[in-house]
Amino acid sequence: MRRREFIGNLGVLGAAAGSTLFSRGSSALPVQKRPVIAWAGAPPAGAPAGVNVPQFILDLVYGNFVKGLAEFGYEHGRSVDVIKRFDMFSDRVATMEEMVALVKPDVIVAPATLQAVEARKATSTIPIVCGALADAVHLGLIGSEARPGGNVTGIEPYISGLPTNQIELAREIAPTARCLGLLTNMNDPKGPPQVEDLKAACQAIDLSVVEADANTPNDIPGALAALANKKVDVVVVLQTNLLLVRCEQIGAIALEKRLPTVFGYREHVIHGGLVSYGVDLRWCYRRTGYFVDKILRGAHPGDLPIEFPSKLWLAVNLKTAKALDVAIPAALLARGDEVIE
């Protein structure tokens, strides 16, 4: 869509809003003008403009955001208008500043911390909801988790203490392990806190640690090869945006190098990883609908506490276990929320 066409179409949004825009029984409030929600995510794979993400990530992130809106009675084109940043121009991704100026949204939804930081630089007044915040206090996005205080709020999908559980899981699948490999991504705000916690958990049980950092997709093969060359017994992969997006690549290389691998996100296991234990990102992105609803009803984002997932998700891929000749304990399988045959 060209810039002139896009601006022209924006003028039609409000005109399409007639009397009552919500179905009877909907929890959403009737309004005369449909609220506008700006989606600040990246474009899909194959898009002509800028960085793109695989379809399964769009389904995970944007798809569950849409489901979350629906839980509160909101539907694009009927009760709200959702404008995607990557749809604004045909040849590039709009900047956050352009999105704010042209769309004038009532709420901005940012998939992850990077987009939340960019959105916060573009506006200090429009509410911003983030589905996967990290290190938000240190980055100046919020004052505190209990009372954000500014225009940013949302969900933090990292739970302190989770690394200890992941190390315990690693020992379950590799009970004789003495050396653990860490595939890190230290330029992601979520990286350093995880590494610190994982190292502390390993030190507590006298498990040595070897790190290999990957900050671009091209770094991943070399990083996993380095861990294999160091003869690590099991690998823990950090929960970061890059390593999630590249989960298929990581799963394939780990299998090739015969590395039993523990992840934090179930999506890795769906795409060939061995086991995962961590938050369910599907819940995180559905939960953005709750925050959007609260804000559209008049709540200030600074008064909405940051939320954390209350349930952790255990996934096991038995096909990968068989290929790696790893015996998954029956007790672990019995605890599994998701077992891939």
Regions found by a protein language model. Give the residues of each.
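Short hydrophobic alpha-helices and adjacent helix-cap/hinge residues
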Residues: 1-341
